[in-house]
Amino acid sequence: MTDETTKNGPDATAADAAADAAAYVENDTVQEETAQPDPLELLKAENSELRDRYLRLAAEMDNLRRRTEREVKDAKSYSVAGFARDMLAVSDNLRRALDAISPEAKATADAGLTSLIEGVEMTERAMLSALERHGVRKLEPVGQKFDPNFHQAMFEVPNSEVPNNTVVQVVQAGFTIGERVLRPAMVGVAKGGPKPAEAETNSVFDEKDA
């Protein structure tokens, strides 16, 4: 055999195949190493996801806390609504008793009647004060623009000196409890006066907090 035959013989072919196989394995190993994600990047991604979950959970807990506080506050504020509404009937009767006494009768009343009148007035004031301590407040609508959210119009009063729909008389007092109307005020409103100003009026609650 010649040297050329020896180089190109079966041994050379086997050596080439082995070299190709080794190169393939090495290349595949490099590709696998390249395809594996960076552990640091994985930790960063996991940390970011956990942080997002924490922020969402914190926001949900804060909303739950606020909602619970509001519900507890409302429960305390409005738990006496039924009782307060019943007490308004008593207050109405006290006011009717006082209104039934004319100014002339008061002026000429003897000591006994005067004491009785003063006692009823003190009782009415004490009752309103007790209701106010529990968040029940009396509306004072005379002179205000009629607001159907707080007033119930019973009749119209011809009056050219004040704007139309101005409350000029209260038939039955109205009350609020917290941010709600416990009972609207029954009122008489002016008719025949100038057109009311277009400017917006503050609500009863805004005026109370001012």
Curated annotation (Swiss-Prot):
Domain of life of the native organism: Bacteria
An example Gene Ontology molecular-function term: protein homodimerization activity
Entry-linked Gene3D superfamilies: 3.90.20.20, Head domain of nucleotide exchange factor GrpE
Example GO BP: protein folding
Region annotated Disordered, chain positions: 191-210
NCBIfam families: PRK14140.1, PRK14141.1, PRK14150.1
Protein name: Protein GrpE
Organism: Rhizobium etli (strain CIAT 652)
